[in-house]
Amino acid sequence: MPLVSQDLLTIMHRPDVNELSLQTVAEFYETYLCGHQYYYELRHKQRELRLRFKKGDLCHLLGIQHVLNGSDNVGETGFVKLKNGENTFVSLEKANKGGYLNMLYRMLYFPFVYQLIHAPHVVTNTVNQTGNVVKAQFSFHNGKREHYVELKLRRESANNPDFFVPVSFSESGKNAHRASIVIQTKKILPYDEGYVAITKANVKY
């Protein structure tokens, strides 16, 4: 039976392509992840971590850019193509089978992000400025039945040093076993609470 977006809140196993659609993933992402601010008070020099999801980031997190070419398949336009059923598992496989197979597990494990942000292990990353290494200050990771998912986070802007956005999602059968930062408090806040709008007068370079 095909899964609906609400089913993805509590899934316990990696869904099959016959159970899940990218349209459902987009609906789930928009309904349960976007529009909220996930607040974590940490026992760390970065005392507050405020995570926000944006519609235009979903395609990148799923790895669509490794399967399809063209700016219309990423960002907010790409999100619309997922939500309206234009870009599907079938169409991705037809367009680029190798890229599709490389990204398939990432796409199928993505629904675990909801459970991950509600019970994360938070770790710091060494920000590498060279090559194609993702520049991310923090990661959320957790394991599901010996398979691990990781969400890497990057600061939104210098003007809002406590606000972070997801920059990369991955799944793996291995975990690096890094020491976790203690989470003292976590809660869900309105999307823009505490955010300082960037203007020409207050922008930092």
Identify the meaning behind each predicted range.
Residues M1-A136, H141, Y205:
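An acidic, glycine-rich, mixed-charge low-complexity segment common to nucleic-acid enzymes
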